[in-house]
Amino acid sequence: MPGSAGRTGEGRRPGGHRRELHPRRRAPRPADRAEPFAALLAQLIGTAPAVTAVPSLAPSPPWTGWDHSGSGLWPDRDDEGHDLNEVTGPAWVDEAARLVRQQMRRCDAPDKIGHGDWESQNIEWQNGEPLAVHDWDSVIAQPEVAIVGLAAAVWPAAGGPGEAASIAQTEDFLSAYQATAGATWTTGQIRLAWTAGLWVRLLNAKKDAARGGGPQLDLLGVEIEQRVARAGLHTGDWLSRGSGLAR
């Protein structure tokens, strides 16, 4: 990581495989508040090199890949090697993903470099200060609102099934990031952040659906109406008919 925001705990072997540079230590993390996680991400984005100064970071990992170049709705392969385009339904998940891609593609903000897997399980702390950040094969180049929105949707996840940010935790992260970065986002920017964050939650829900169900699908079924509303997506009546099936 650039600057003093922490150090990487992983490296690359030839061929792109990761290796541990030191045993991962489970240092106590800050109290479950968004501010430290948002501030660390703001420091990373603010000190990262320009996108033009590094080799291409495309394609984005599937869970961040609303910007993928495949011909289907979903990336050609998810992070487990499966083609989610071959999985039928749920219809509300597919329709929401379509709307997310449609809205995000209209975002013309410049790309920045950030971390695309900003979950608490990938960040170590010591005495309330960042000690190490892991999973550097998840670095992405996307608009700032997208990077932050993706993080805001998942930051509390510590590796357990079904873990993700609640609606309130997502709101707290977005507010904390703006405060740390000294920015006041427009309504449109905030909606784009919610939209990008919805992508990772939808992909996780779709993966659960491929397995016949699971906690990510169940959780998003409860939250979907609030998340699409905050994203400003126009859903028609498919949402009220479809999401209830996931509850």
Language-model features: locations:
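Mechanochemical coupling/switch segment within NTP-driven translocation systems
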Residues: P90-V100
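Active-site acidic catalytic loop and adjacent metal/ATP-binding pocket
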Residues: R101-A146, A158
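All-alpha amphipathic helical-bundle segments outside canonical DNA-binding/catalytic cores
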Residues: T184-A196
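Conserved structural core of kinase catalytic domains
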Residues: A5-P36
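ATP/Mg2+ or Mg2+-diphosphate-binding catalytic cores
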Residues: L73, S175, L202-R247
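N-terminal membrane-targeting/anchoring modules of bacterial envelope and secretion proteins
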Residues: M1-P2, H22, P62
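A cross-family kinase active-site recognition segment
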Residues: A27-T88, A109-D111
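Active-site activation/catalytic loop segments of kinase-like enzymes and analogous catalytic loops
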Residues: V145-G182, A196-P215
